Amino acid sequence: MDFKDGFFRNDEEHQLKIIQVIRKYQPDFIFCNAPDDRHIDHPKGSQLIVEASFLSGLSKINTVDFLENTQKQWRPKNIYHYIQWKNLDPDFIFDVSGFHNTKMDAVKCYSSQFYDPKSKEPETPISTKNFLDFVKSRANDFGRLIGVEHGEGFISNRKLGFSSFDELI
Protein backbone atom coordinates (compact mmCIF):
# COMPACT_ATOMS: atom_id res chain seq x y z
CA MET A 1 0.00 0.00 0.00
CA ASP A 2 3.09 2.14 0.23
CA PHE A 3 2.13 4.00 3.42
CA LYS A 4 5.10 5.93 4.78
CA ASP A 5 6.14 5.06 8.35
CA GLY A 6 5.22 7.87 10.70
CA PHE A 7 3.72 10.06 8.00
CA PHE A 8 0.59 8.41 6.60
CA ARG A 9 -2.68 10.16 7.31
CA ASN A 10 -6.30 9.25 7.84
CA ASP A 11 -7.40 11.05 4.69
CA GLU A 12 -9.34 10.26 1.52
CA GLU A 13 -6.29 8.96 -0.38
CA HIS A 14 -5.35 6.45 2.32
CA GLN A 15 -8.96 5.54 3.12
CA LEU A 16 -9.64 4.67 -0.53
CA LYS A 17 -6.66 2.31 -0.59
CA ILE A 18 -7.99 0.51 2.50
CA ILE A 19 -11.53 0.48 1.07
CA GLN A 20 -10.24 -1.22 -2.10
CA VAL A 21 -8.62 -3.98 -0.04
CA ILE A 22 -11.69 -4.45 2.17
CA ARG A 23 -13.95 -4.70 -0.88
CA LYS A 24 -11.58 -7.10 -2.60
CA TYR A 25 -11.33 -9.57 0.30
CA GLN A 26 -14.71 -8.88 1.97
CA PRO A 27 -13.67 -9.86 5.50
CA ASP A 28 -16.24 -10.34 8.24
CA PHE A 29 -13.59 -9.58 10.86
CA ILE A 30 -10.70 -7.14 10.81
CA PHE A 31 -7.95 -7.24 13.40
CA CYS A 32 -5.95 -4.05 13.65
CA ASN A 33 -3.72 -1.95 15.87
CA ALA A 34 -4.64 -0.75 19.32
CA PRO A 35 -6.66 2.48 19.48
CA ASP A 36 -4.10 3.86 21.97
CA ASP A 37 -0.42 3.01 21.81
CA ARG A 38 3.12 4.31 22.23
CA HIS A 39 3.94 4.30 18.49
CA ILE A 40 2.06 7.07 16.66
CA ASP A 41 1.34 4.89 13.62
CA HIS A 42 -0.65 2.37 15.65
CA PRO A 43 -3.59 4.54 16.79
CA LYS A 44 -3.54 6.40 13.45
CA GLY A 45 -3.71 3.10 11.59
CA SER A 46 -6.43 1.87 13.92
CA GLN A 47 -8.64 4.89 13.28
CA LEU A 48 -7.93 4.70 9.54
CA ILE A 49 -9.17 1.09 9.51
CA VAL A 50 -12.29 1.94 11.52
CA GLU A 51 -13.27 4.82 9.24
CA ALA A 52 -12.39 3.03 5.99
CA SER A 53 -14.39 0.00 7.15
CA PHE A 54 -17.46 2.17 7.60
CA LEU A 55 -16.95 3.95 4.29
CA SER A 56 -16.44 0.66 2.43
CA GLY A 57 -20.09 -0.14 3.13
CA LEU A 58 -21.39 2.99 1.41
CA SER A 59 -22.63 2.50 -2.15
CA LYS A 60 -21.91 6.12 -3.12
CA ILE A 61 -18.18 5.62 -2.67
CA ASN A 62 -16.90 4.18 -5.92
CA THR A 63 -13.73 2.11 -6.17
CA VAL A 64 -12.24 -0.21 -8.74
CA ASP A 65 -9.97 -3.18 -8.27
CA PHE A 66 -6.54 -3.52 -9.82
CA LEU A 67 -8.11 -4.73 -13.09
CA GLU A 68 -10.37 -1.65 -13.19
CA ASN A 69 -13.52 -3.64 -12.30
CA THR A 70 -16.08 -1.77 -10.22
CA GLN A 71 -16.10 -3.03 -6.64
CA LYS A 72 -19.24 -3.74 -4.64
CA GLN A 73 -19.77 -2.17 -1.25
CA TRP A 74 -18.78 -4.29 1.74
CA ARG A 75 -18.66 -3.54 5.44
CA PRO A 76 -16.94 -5.87 7.91
CA LYS A 77 -19.17 -7.04 10.75
CA ASN A 78 -16.53 -6.66 13.45
CA ILE A 79 -13.29 -4.80 14.09
CA TYR A 80 -11.07 -6.05 16.88
CA HIS A 81 -8.02 -4.19 18.13
CA TYR A 82 -5.16 -6.21 19.51
CA ILE A 83 -3.36 -4.78 22.51
CA GLN A 84 0.22 -3.70 21.96
CA TRP A 85 2.51 -1.58 24.14
CA LYS A 86 0.11 -0.01 26.63
CA ASN A 87 -1.73 -1.99 29.28
CA LEU A 88 -5.26 -1.57 27.96
CA ASP A 89 -8.25 -3.42 29.37
CA PRO A 90 -9.50 -5.98 26.86
CA ASP A 91 -13.19 -6.32 26.05
CA PHE A 92 -12.59 -10.03 25.62
CA ILE A 93 -9.73 -12.50 25.90
CA PHE A 94 -9.29 -15.31 23.41
CA ASP A 95 -7.70 -18.61 24.45
CA VAL A 96 -4.54 -18.88 22.33
CA SER A 97 -2.89 -21.63 24.36
CA GLY A 98 -2.49 -23.92 21.37
CA PHE A 99 -1.06 -21.14 19.20
CA HIS A 100 1.16 -19.11 21.52
CA ASN A 101 4.44 -20.53 20.20
CA THR A 102 3.31 -19.86 16.62
CA LYS A 103 2.55 -16.26 17.58
CA MET A 104 5.96 -15.82 19.16
CA ASP A 105 7.63 -17.28 16.06
CA ALA A 106 5.67 -14.80 13.92
CA VAL A 107 6.73 -11.90 16.14
CA LYS A 108 10.36 -12.99 15.85
CA CYS A 109 10.12 -12.74 12.04
CA TYR A 110 10.61 -9.02 12.61
CA SER A 111 13.99 -9.75 14.20
CA SER A 112 15.53 -6.42 13.20
CA GLN A 113 13.10 -4.66 15.55
CA PHE A 114 13.85 -6.80 18.60
CA TYR A 115 16.80 -7.58 20.82
CA ASP A 116 19.98 -8.58 19.04
CA PRO A 117 23.16 -8.55 21.14
CA LYS A 118 25.21 -8.04 17.94
CA SER A 119 23.21 -5.04 16.73
CA LYS A 120 24.93 -1.68 16.34
CA GLU A 121 21.58 0.12 16.12
CA PRO A 122 20.40 2.35 18.99
CA GLU A 123 18.20 0.60 21.54
CA THR A 124 14.46 1.18 21.27
CA PRO A 125 11.70 0.25 23.73
CA ILE A 126 11.00 -2.97 21.81
CA SER A 127 14.64 -3.90 21.21
CA THR A 128 15.44 -4.26 24.89
CA LYS A 129 16.51 -7.65 26.15
CA ASN A 130 13.30 -8.19 28.12
CA PHE A 131 10.65 -7.04 25.62
CA LEU A 132 9.78 -10.49 24.26
CA ASP A 133 9.57 -11.71 27.86
CA PHE A 134 6.97 -8.99 28.43
CA VAL A 135 4.95 -10.23 25.43
CA LYS A 136 5.01 -13.77 26.88
CA SER A 137 4.10 -12.51 30.36
CA ARG A 138 1.11 -10.59 29.02
CA ALA A 139 -0.16 -13.74 27.28
CA ASN A 140 0.33 -15.68 30.51
CA ASP A 141 -1.55 -13.04 32.51
CA PHE A 142 -4.44 -12.80 30.06
CA GLY A 143 -4.59 -16.61 30.11
CA ARG A 144 -4.65 -16.58 33.91
CA LEU A 145 -7.63 -14.22 33.87
CA ILE A 146 -9.72 -16.72 31.87
CA GLY A 147 -8.32 -19.92 33.37
CA VAL A 148 -6.13 -21.07 30.47
CA GLU A 149 -2.41 -21.12 29.75
CA HIS A 150 -2.21 -18.21 27.27
CA GLY A 151 -4.68 -15.51 26.27
CA GLU A 152 -4.79 -12.66 23.78
CA GLY A 153 -6.78 -9.57 24.70
CA PHE A 154 -8.83 -7.60 22.21
CA ILE A 155 -10.80 -4.37 22.23
CA SER A 156 -14.06 -4.25 20.28
CA ASN A 157 -15.71 -1.23 18.67
CA ARG A 158 -19.12 -2.56 19.60
CA LYS A 159 -20.82 -4.63 22.26
CA LEU A 160 -20.38 -8.35 21.80
CA GLY A 161 -23.42 -10.62 21.74
CA PHE A 162 -23.69 -14.34 22.30
CA SER A 163 -26.50 -16.76 21.52
CA SER A 164 -25.34 -19.42 23.96
CA PHE A 165 -23.52 -19.44 27.26
CA ASP A 166 -21.75 -22.56 25.97
CA GLU A 167 -19.58 -20.27 23.84
CA LEU A 168 -18.06 -18.70 26.94
CA ILE A 169 -15.20 -20.28 28.87
Provide a role label for each language-model segment:
Residues 1-6:
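A conserved beta-strand->alpha-helix junction
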Residues 9-169:
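Metal-dependent de-N-acetylase/amidase catalytic core
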